[in-house]
């Protein structure tokens, strides 16, 4: 006999993965003092491995974990950090089907976001 909360196929609703998530691609941070935040990342074992060509944005990596530090002065991330302190300003999830996950999120009430991609940048749909 299956518990009342299980599906007939044996799966459990709490374990379903309708968005097809498969981990995190990156977590993006901003801080009023980006130099101090970068130093904290390095003390935690992260290495600065790449910098954006035209913006004050740095990629830190430790193993398979990616942190992005956004120090771009006129960005939403920096304006938010100046008001609220060190903050996570974006999270990128790995998904099996990006289009399907995006459409499902919108169908569930998420709002789409389209940033302003600069030269040589990708315009990636976001929510």
Write out the residue ranges for each language-model feature.
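Membrane-interface interhelical loops and short amphipathic "cap" helices
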Residues: 49, 74-80
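Vicinal oxygen chelate
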Residues: 1-17, 21-32, 61-71, 78-127
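Conserved active-site tyrosine of GNAT-family acetyltransferases
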Residues: 37-42, 105
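Short secondary-structure junctions
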Residues: 43-54, 112-118
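Transmitter module of two-component histidine kinases
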Residues: 32-37, 46-49
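Short, structured motif recognition centered on aromatic/hydrophobic residues
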Residues: 23-28, 41, 46, 60, ...
């Amino acid at each position: 006999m299956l518990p009342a909360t299980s599906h007939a196929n044996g799966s459990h609703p709490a374990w379903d993965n309708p968005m097809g998530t498969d981990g995190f691609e990156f977590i993006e941070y901003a801080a009023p003092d980006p130099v101090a935040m970068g130093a904290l990342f390095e003390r935690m074992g992260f290495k600065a491995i790449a910098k954006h060509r035209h913006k004050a944005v740095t990629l830190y990596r430790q193993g398979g974990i990616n942190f992005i530090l956004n120090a771009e002065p006129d960005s939403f991330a920096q304006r938010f950090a100046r008001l609220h302190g060190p903050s996570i300003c974006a999270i990128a999830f790995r998904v099996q089907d990006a289009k399907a996950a995006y459409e499902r999120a919108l169908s569930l009430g998420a709002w789409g976001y389209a940033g302003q991609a600069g030269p040589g940048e990708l315009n990636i749909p976001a929510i």
